[in-house]
Amino acid sequence: MNPLVIAVDTGNKNIKTPHTEPFNSGLICHGAIPPAVKSDTLLFDGNYYTLTQSRIPYMYNKTTDWSYYVLTLIAIAKEMMAMGYVRPGQKQVKQDVCLAMGLPPTHIHDLASEYDKYFGRDGRRVVFTYNNVDFEIRIVRVMVFPQGVAAIAPYMSKIMARPEAYTYIIDIGGYTTDVVKFSRGGQVDMAFCESFNNGVIKMYDEVQRAVRNRFQLDVDDYTIDNILRCGYNPGKELNDVVHTTAQNYARTLIRSLKDIGVDLTLSYPVFIGGGSILMRPIIESELGRDDYLFIDDPRANAVGYKMMAESRLTAENR
């Protein structure tokens, strides 16, 4: 019997799985003392952990400390609950897991084996408690897929039907923007896979700096999200500074894509990732065209990882 496929997108800003709401890539270790408020609490290896809105500093290699391992255990527990593998009132769960994950295409060669060691732990039994449910899992396999490529898996038939010679997959994430070029035949052009440090976190930093310099106020990522996406208006002047700074950042990002040879006029652009969703109105105004694809589900990569892992397991069992 195949293990249960759990897909986790370990982003620099958010952790995503196919069936749960994204949660912030932030963690507090309370040591051996349980926190006063126990929502979203994990007990692992004698330490209590809770989620926080403060994000972990950017890590090129997420296997260098314990943070993303613990975040992934929380994601696995949340996903199993959302998928119905934990019944109401159930206190113990035992499950073998195939963990489907992703990396920027340019990082896979260097980091895929590290992910296998770090998250797989040689298939050893892992015991933890999440929200008063005891989990015993074995990660019997780790599969690593290319970000961006995974996200478009459900849309490939639509993309393949396009008349353009090339499609660019532009994944604006937390810290990086990853660009993958496809030929019309669906082949990835490995000579053009770019990853550069112009993600949405840098935009937050620029907005925070502008607000601090102008108003001597500190705004966090979630306040900025609330202003840009949800219509929150903390006052005309502050609102204008946030929107103007974000617009300038998005324009610079689009122009930097053009500078590295991404042709957004003759190709078919596909935008994915939380940064694309956040900056969508500005990106659309900069494109100057109305035939493009925005994949507006921030969980798209996680959904793609799950599809690709299940497809691989099915093929192996034939």
Which residues fall in each region the model found?
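Acidic, metal/cofactor-coordinating or nucleic-acid-engaging core segments within structured domains
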Residues: V211-F215
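Phosphate-handling catalytic cores of nucleic-acid transaction enzymes
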Residues: I170
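Nucleotide/phosphate-binding catalytic cleft detector across ATP-hydrolyzing
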Residues: M1-T167, G186-K202, Y222-F271, S276-R318
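Short, acidic (Asp/Glu-rich) active-site segment that either coordinates a divalent metal cofactor
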Residues: D178-K181
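Plant-skewed but cross-kingdom recognition/interaction modules and surfaces
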Residues: D218-D220
